[in-house]
Amino acid sequence: MASSMLSSATMVASPAQATMVAPFNGLKSSAAFPATRKANNDITSITSNGGRVNCMQVWPPIGKKKFETLSYLPDLTDSELAKEVDYLIRNKWIPCVEFELEHGFVYREHGNSPGYYDGRYWTMWKLPLFGCTDSAQVLKEVEECKKEYPNAFIRIIGFDNTRQVQCISFIAYKPPSFTG
């Protein structure tokens, strides 16, 4: 009874289709390639320039906290901050000022894996500056935040509201009590 329930389509074998691609025949003969090579023992012509590179010292990781973009540079002056803010405004990003009272850097207090409580999410100072066209407006907000929270880390971020991503972030102010 069960055999009569099967459709006839399952019983018919279909013929194998011809392939449009030629089968792989292995590697080509080495006769097409030049057999002799010039022995090159000159170390200065190696592409990595390994013989001429001097060792460079890396950024010392002990006692130096890494923050955001440009954190390896000395603190930015007001004119340098204004240039950075002008850059993010030219790119049509929305400036936003954020602050952090305790840790101005990524830290892992509640585990080893990244998550919400690892120092990447700061408190927003007021609202993002939608429609901002002048870096002086943003720097004025940074100064107000400094007056309100003199012991806070303050950063400026550039938010792209079209792609809904943060495009740039840099420290605008470190508290005087910070030694790192």
Swiss-Prot record:
It is a peripheral membrane protein. SUPFAM superfamilies: RuBisCO, small subunit. The modification Phosphoserine is found at S113. GO terms for molecular function: copper ion binding; mRNA binding; ribulose-bisphosphate carboxylase activity; salicylic acid binding. GO terms for cellular component: apoplast; chloroplast; chloroplast envelope; chloroplast membrane; chloroplast stroma; chloroplast thylakoid membrane; cytosolic ribosome; mitochondrion. Its main location: plastid. Residues 1-54 form a transit peptide. It is found in: Plastid, Chloroplast membrane; Plastid, Chloroplast stroma. Keywords: Calvin cycle, Carbon dioxide fixation, Chloroplast, Membrane, Phosphoprotein, Photorespiration, Photosynthesis, Plastid, Transit peptide. It comes from the Eukaryota. Signal peptide: none annotated. The keyword Ligase does not apply. Pfam families: RbcS, RuBisCO_small. One of its GO terms (biological process) is ribulose bisphosphate carboxylase complex assembly. InterPro entries: RuBisCO_ssu, RuBisCO_ssu_dom, RuBisCO_ssu_N, RuBisCO_ssu_sf. Belongs to the RuBisCO small chain family. RuBisCO catalyzes two reactions: the carboxylation of D-ribulose 1,5-bisphosphate, the primary event in carbon dioxide fixation, as well as the oxidative fragmentation of the pentose substrate. Both reactions occur simultaneously and in competition at the same active site. Although the small subunit is not catalytic it is essential for maximal activity. There are four genes coding for RBS in Arabidopsis thaliana. The basic functional RuBisCO is composed of a large chain homodimer in a 'head-to-tail' conformation. In form I RuBisCO this homodimer is arranged in a barrel-like tetramer with the small subunits forming a tetrameric 'cap' on each end of the 'barrel'. Heterohexadecamer of 8 large and 8 small subunits. HAMAP family: RuBisCO_S_bact (MF_00859). This is Ribulose bisphosphate carboxylase small subunit 1A, chloroplastic. It comes from Arabidopsis thaliana. The lineage of its organism: Eukaryota, Viridiplantae, Streptophyta, Embryophyta, Tracheophyta.
